[in-house]
């Protein structure tokens, strides 16, 4: 088993999503001692946001017309796609920032969502090319967005489920911790509940 571990929180050791992704990966390793893990810290080693020259590398067949910096970004894009395609389980740390995901995580998504590599266009519509993988998302929020009037503000989990589904990955599970900014007791309770839920999610990922 190969695990791709993505962190995107800017909060370092204070990050709840990092606590959860580390716990998820540890449990995957315990149950699969031979597993290999690739860790990408998208906040510490940020991926430059997509621009025209970088996107052109998705279709390029040579070095003509590109400078050294752009060619390095083309190589980075290829490495990121290769890691995704080679992995069996993707563990994503995705805190909610302003109702969506961190821009650092979006930058990774923009690099790996490549026509002809991770999805393709057909006469009947797009088809994902990365099926058979499993995604476990550590979803963290300062408030409550899974239910009630604020549920309509959630452009985090729905977006991730949609984009991974577009790439062909339909097995997307969430380990959620909410109300993290509502005091120490609420934070502790949320993390405890998330850790409890994590065991079932990991077991499902391994068993399926």
From Swiss-Prot:
Reactions performed catalytically: 2 a quinone + NADH + H(+) = 2 a 1,4-benzosemiquinone + NAD(+); N,N-dimethyl-1,4-phenylenediamine + anthranilate + 2 NAD(+) = 2-(4-dimethylaminophenyl)diazenylbenzoate + 2 NADH + 2 H(+)
Keywords, comma-separated and alphabetical: Flavoprotein, FMN, NAD, Oxidoreductase, Plasmid
Needed co-factor(s): FMN
Residue stretches in coiled coil: none
Gene3D superfamilies: 3.40.50.360
Pfam family, one: Flavodoxin_2
Residues involved in FMN binding: 9, 15-17, 96-99, 140-143
EC number: 1.6.5.-, 1.7.1.17
This protein's record includes keyword Oxidoreductase: yes
Domain of life: Bacteria
Oligomeric and partner information: Homodimer.
Similarity comment: family membership: Belongs to the azoreductase type 1 family.
Cited function: Quinone reductase that provides resistance to thiol-specific stress caused by electrophilic quinones. Also exhibits azoreductase activity. Catalyzes the reductive cleavage of the azo bond in aromatic azo compounds to the corresponding amines.
Protein name stated in the entry: FMN-dependent NADH:quinone oxidoreductase
């Amino acid at each position: 088993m190969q695990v791709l571990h993505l962190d995107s929180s800017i909060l370092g050791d204070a990050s709840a999503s990092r606590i959860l992704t580390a716990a998820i990966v540890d449990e995957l390793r315990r149950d699969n001692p031979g597993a290999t893990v690739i860790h990408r810290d998208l906040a510490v080693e940020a991926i430059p946001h997509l621009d025209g020259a970088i996107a052109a590398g998705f279709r390029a067949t040579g070095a003509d017309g590109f400078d050294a910096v752009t060619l390095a970004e083309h190589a980075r894009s290829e490495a990121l796609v290769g890691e995704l395609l080679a992995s069996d389980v993707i563990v994503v740390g995705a805190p909610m920032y302003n109702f969506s995901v961190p821009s650092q995580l979006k930058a990774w998504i923009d690099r790996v969502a490549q026509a002809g590599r991770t999805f393709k266009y057909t006469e009947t519509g797009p088809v994902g090319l990365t099926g058979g993988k499993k995604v476990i998302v550590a979803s963290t929020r300062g408030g409550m967005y899974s239910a009630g009037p604020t549920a309509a503000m959630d452009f985090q989990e729905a977006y991730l489920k949609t984009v991974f589904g577009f790439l062909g990955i339909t097995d997307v599970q969430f380990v959620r911790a909410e109300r993290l900014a509502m005091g120490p007791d609420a934070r502790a309770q949320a993390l405890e509940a998330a850790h409890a839920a994590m065991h079932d999610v990991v077991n499902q990922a391994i068993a399926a």
